[in-house]
């Protein structure tokens, strides 16, 4: 574990702030300029559509009666705390994992503020093709998904590199 926070993954915390600010500013813009369910086509497959999500990703548990607001609040605080602790333990050079953790934290905190302030998450990025629609989402959701993908990619690359090192060590041992 790095002895100084400046040598740890916490050096990447600026990304949390960047994601959080971009997410909150975009949502404030939507709230100021759109009526609920109002939609503006930007491209033949992409709209800004203001929707309220009372659940999680893909509106999971959106009709659960209200308890989910506090459940997802607890989950966001818990994961953000855990990932921040892990960032403190990571060397700052582990950029892929540090970036992944900060993207997830920034997204979780962005949606957390919505839940606490409004009781729902503001979604507005709406992709579709003909009659097939992908559920609307926001910048925080995107950051969480990209962060999760980076965690998976990092684990695959780390496992591959570990296997290469082990094979190299076995080769060197066999030559002696």
Curated annotation (Swiss-Prot):
GO terms for biological process: proteolysis. The keyword Membrane applies. The keyword Hydrolase applies. GO terms for cellular component: plasma membrane. The active site is at 123, 141. It catalyses: Release of signal peptides from bacterial membrane prolipoproteins. Hydrolyzes -Xaa-Yaa-Zaa-|-(S,diacylglyceryl)Cys-, in which Xaa is hydrophobic (preferably Leu), and Yaa (Ala or Ser) and Zaa (Gly or Ala) have small, neutral side chains. It is a multi-pass membrane protein. GO terms for molecular function: aspartic-type endopeptidase activity. The chain crosses the membrane at residues 12-32, 67-87, 94-116, 137-157. Pathway: Protein modification; lipoprotein biosynthesis (signal peptide cleavage). It comes from the Bacteria. NCBIfam families: lspA (TIGR00077). PANTHER family: LIPOPROTEIN SIGNAL PEPTIDASE. This is Lipoprotein signal peptidase. It comes from Shewanella woodyi (strain ATCC 51908 / MS32). The lineage of its organism: Bacteria, Pseudomonadati, Pseudomonadota, Gammaproteobacteria, Alteromonadales. The gene is lspA.
């Amino acid at each position: 574990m790095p002895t100084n926070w400046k040598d740890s993954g916490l050096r990447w915390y600026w990304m949390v702030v960047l994601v959080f600010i971009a997410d909150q500013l975009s949502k404030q813009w939507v709230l100021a300029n759109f009526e609920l369910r109002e939609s503006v086509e930007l491209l033949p497959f992409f709209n800004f559509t203001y929707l309220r999500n009372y659940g999680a990703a893909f509106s999971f548990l959106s009709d659960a009666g209200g308890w989910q607001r506090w459940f997802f609040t607890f989950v966001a605080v818990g994961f953000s705390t855990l990932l921040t602790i892990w960032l403190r333990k990571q060397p700052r050079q582990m950029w892929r994992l540090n970036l992944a953790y900060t993207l997830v934290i920034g997204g979780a905190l962005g949606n957390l503020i919505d839940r606490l302030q409004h009781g729902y998450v503001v979604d507005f990025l709406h992709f579709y093709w003909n009659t097939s629609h992908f559920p609307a989402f926001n910048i925080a959701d995107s950051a969480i998904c990209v962060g999760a993908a980076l965690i998976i990619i990092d684990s695959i690359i780390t496992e591959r590199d570990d296997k290469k090192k082990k094979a190299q060590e076995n080769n060197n041992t066999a030559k002696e």
